[in-house]
């Protein structure tokens, strides 16, 4: 392993990240909220630390290896969460402990959306903007966004991109060069953000709210500038805009690229994962609206449909916006919605969860095993569309699922040891590991009241979920460090 190479890249990335603390200074000056110094201090500290890390190894030019890439990704996300918390620590309003500041920053960067803050409507606009910006930067992954910049700095980007995007589709090529691939994803991400902000503004939001909510919508993050989330606006048009862009943001960005390049929407209909994703949302919607109408939770079927549609798309895509307190819904609905976050968005999207692709392959593998029981000698391939899936990919999906289950069990037991009840522990961990945000029980209204140890466990779960577990777990493997 080339530690000087890792150190050099870490320093560069930290210096680049410090720049993200300057836009909130502008917001603070525009609104005169008095919080500009918190971001100035955060910028200076982050920049200086990055500079001190980079200077001793600035002439190191060796190519980054795969193992180095994993270390950079894991280390940078931990460091990023720490330094992303700096403005919260330097701020006097709100006044936050180290634990709360790191929790909020990690939640933002991993696009989880769990928060320890309350009374959002009274907080300085610059703080609110910074939270939303953290989610937007984290949405596509700081590393993926930096892949387009690193080659200009003399650093190879391929290994970083592979480490940041694990899973069944990580080797998909949109363009021949990795730099062009990252840039294509960036343009799509930026284009969707601008379109979403404009749509929110047309629907009735002010400019500030439109920009802030477009950040967290396209990032599938769920942070809001108001305690009541999207429900604050009480505007059906705003809700429909949110539903549309949450739905789009949780679709594989590679698929968006193919559709834009070919100028044909047929690719959405032909893609097995996109079809499964849409079918999953449709079936959830039927069940939720049907049960809301059956229990007469709302005065009309229209209200049931609107509330049901919004919460199904928001929770199933792991965004976490709310227009109502879904944890108070009758019967199985709250738990079923939390379960839907385990599936999450499509692979290659900003959504969390295990991903539709993995769940689809697990289902197809289960069907194949049933066929094998009936016809023991038959060769039954697992197929996506007309293409057979390599056995190595299927094995990888099963490996991910097994590790996910074991990790979930261990972390839930750890949360129970902190004194949390079973419902709160289960939903808090599900919301953290799946990068969802809102939970049930004591965390239905926020995470400020849970024990300090539980906050650190949830923050670790957010990081594991954002990097899809293996990227962090590989670092504790004896094989990884053997040579």
Which role fits each region the language model picked out?
Residues 1-483:
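Membrane-proximal intracellular helices of multi-pass ion channels
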